[in-house]
């Protein structure tokens, strides 16, 4: 029997900016088992619901994660609106969806840059983050913040985004698209990238379903599930699109899905801007949920399905706030993908899965 040893990976590693720790059990340079450990940045945000009223907690919910801030803000507000039986105007739904899709573009461009940097592909890293900067400028010009937008509130929006600004968003995305398509062509068709990604970290559709994998991680293994199409968080009635899937289930397939989702998000935004209604943006309302009233919603974050649950207690504070983030769902798939791979491929596999520990540890 070959000698086995345990090598620690993280929580601080030059390839992975996330504080994820893995104990890698290796045998002859191959990973036999990966044991995850998290909890290094736990902040107890859900507990703060007992000390902040519902309006105040909206600012905290948005800070669960910087990359997914818009999605967390939309998820929290939507769950509270379900609990309070508040129906927001159509314009609010459209603007939230537009900002959420911009956040998806931002997240995937950030991820692509980090992956390129791990390859040593510095030119691609710079090009990817140069395009990402355009999205951050859109956020800043329309909402005032580059990361934390603070535009959502329970019952609507704090301020409107004018039609001229929305048209400017479309113009920016149209100008970005040729550069982005050239960037993706460079990355996906590069032989050195293909050699590092093809056939690495393969997960079959059967395993993906059994492990309840979500988001691009699952769709790269032919799991045709996207919350934007199904369930409470769907907005397929607002725009025409289909879930993007790949068939190989390896690192390359996960890259294909995310790269295609950026262009899909651009198309969704363009369609929404072209038919956005003008029925107002709602506004702040008095928040007095009945004791025991509940609200829940699922939305498709850049990394997959996120679930939000709120429960009232008859006061202005929530009795309970709960989030289940996509990385929580995907940790089992991550450890499965690492089994049997060369230890040199571990960073690539983790990066293509794109875990977000800030979301997971709240």
Q: What do the PLM-derived regions correspond to, one by one?
A:
Residues 1-362:
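Active-site bordering "gate/hinge" segments
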């Amino acid at each position: 029997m070959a000698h086995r040893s345990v090598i620690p990976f993280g929580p601080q590693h030059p390839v992975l900016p996330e504080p994820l720790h893995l104990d890698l059990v290796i045998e002859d340079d191959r990973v036999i088992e990966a044991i995850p450990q998290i909890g290094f940045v736990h902040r107890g945000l859900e507990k703060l619901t007992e000390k902040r009223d519902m309006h105040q907690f909206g600012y905290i919910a948005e800070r669960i994660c910087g990359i997914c801030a818009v999605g967390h803000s939309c998820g929290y507000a939507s769950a509270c609106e379900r609990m309070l039986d508040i129906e927001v105007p159509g314009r609010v739904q459209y603007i939230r969806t537009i900002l959420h899709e911009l956040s998806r573009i931002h997240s995937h461009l950030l991820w692509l840059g980090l992956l390129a940097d791990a390859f040593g592909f510095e030119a691609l890293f710079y090009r990817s983050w140069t395009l990402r900067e355009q999205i951050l400028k859109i956020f800043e010009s329309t909402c005032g913040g580059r990361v934390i937008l603070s535009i959502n509130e329970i019952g609507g929006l704090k301020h409107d985004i004018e039609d001229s600004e929305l048209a400017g968003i479309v113009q920016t995305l149209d100008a970005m698209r040729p550069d982005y398509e050239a960037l993706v062509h460079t990355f996906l068709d590069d032989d050195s990238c293909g050699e590092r990604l093809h056939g690495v970290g393969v997960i079959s559709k059967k395993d993906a379903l059994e492990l309840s994998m979500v988001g691009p991680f699952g769709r790269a293994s032919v799991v045709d599930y996207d919350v934007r199409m199904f369930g409470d968080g769907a907005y397929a009635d607002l725009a025409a699109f289909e879930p993007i899937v790949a068939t190989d289930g390896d690192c390359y397939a996960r890259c294909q899905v995310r790269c295609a989702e950026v262009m899909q998000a651009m198309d969704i935004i363009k369609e929404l801007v072209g038919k956005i209604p003008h029925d107002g943006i709602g506004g702040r309302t008095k928040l007095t949920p009945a004791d025991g009233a509940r609200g829940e919603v699922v939305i498709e974050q850049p990394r997959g399905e996120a679930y939000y649950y709120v429960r009232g207690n008859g006061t202005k504070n929530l009795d309970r706030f709960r989030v289940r983030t996509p990385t929580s769902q995907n940790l089992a798939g991550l450890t499965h993908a690492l089994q049997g791979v060369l230890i040199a491929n571990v960073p690539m596999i983790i990066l293509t899965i794109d875990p977000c520990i800030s979301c997971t540890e709240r």
